[in-house]
């Protein structure tokens, strides 16, 4: 019973609502371009542009979806798609605030769970637009999605197709250069409590943020262990 209590306490300490992000105004727009592959006919785009209030406007325009394995969940994943186009290499959902699946509120969802917050992709062709208050186009934000990827799943979780999130307007510069600059931004100084660590988490891409989350988890568990 003691260990169950410790586990629940650790889970509670690590999980938290994502803050509303209103820092995207003036940031470059991003896009995920889906192309047909030998295993998937899905093609189209998901665009991310700054909304007037600083949140993110999302525009989905897809076709070629299979007729018999929908509806289709889709998420921002924490790693980019490699040159091999292996969607499994994108690893887990983008989840900088340790949200949960099937959460009761949008803030409690994983930041990258677009389907959980806004509904699954439906039908063989699909178009929709919505604003998302929790992802960000600002490179300095913990919720920044540039350089990550989007994966479209079948209703059983199979990964059907995936695409990297890159700059929409090449006038802002080379997409790879921009994402690299974000990835190489310096880490901030460590602090003594997990809450302070969370509020000053380093900038960077999904790989760096996954490491930070792991360090936070280890720190909380260590504090709990010291108390028993």
UniProtKB/Swiss-Prot annotation:
It is found in: Secreted, Cell wall; Membrane. It is a lipid-anchor; GPI-anchor. Keywords: Antioxidant, Cell wall, Copper, Disulfide bond, Glycoprotein, GPI-anchor, Lipoprotein, Membrane, Metal-binding, Oxidoreductase, Secreted, Signal, Virulence. Its main location: secreted. It comes from the Eukaryota. Pfam families: Sod_Cu. This is Cell surface Cu-only superoxide dismutase 5. It comes from Candida albicans (strain SC5314 / ATCC MYA-2876). The gene is SOD5.
């Amino acid at each position: 019973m003691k260990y169950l209590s410790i586990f629940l306490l650790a889970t509670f300490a690590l999980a938290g609502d994502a803050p509303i992000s209103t820092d995207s105004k003036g940031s470059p727009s991003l896009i995920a371009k889906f192309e047909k592959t030998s295993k998937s006919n899905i093609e189209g785009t998901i665009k991310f542009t700054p909304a007037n209030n600083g949140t993110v406007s999302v525009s989905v325009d897809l076709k070629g979806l299979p007729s018999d394995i929908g509806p289709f969940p889709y998420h921002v994943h924490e790693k980019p798609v490699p040159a091999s186009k292996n969607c499994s290499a994108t690893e887990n959902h983008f989840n900088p605030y340790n949200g949960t699946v099937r959460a009761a509120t949008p803030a409690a969802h994983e930041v990258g769970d677009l389907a959980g917050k806004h509904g699954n992709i439906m039908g063989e062709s699909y178009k929709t637009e919505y604003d998302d208050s929790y992802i960000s186009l600002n490179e300095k934000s913990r919720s920044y999605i540039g350089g990550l990827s989007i994966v479209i799943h079948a209703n059983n979780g199979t990964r059907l197709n995936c695409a990297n999130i890159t700059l929409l307007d090449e006038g802002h510069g080379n997409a790879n250069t921009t994402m690299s600059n974000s990835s190489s931004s310096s880490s901030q100084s460590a602090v003594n409590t997990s809450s302070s660590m969370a509020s000053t988490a380093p900038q960077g891409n999904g790989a760096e943020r996954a490491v930070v989350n792991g360090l936070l988890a280890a720190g909380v568990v260590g504090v709990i262990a010291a108390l028993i």
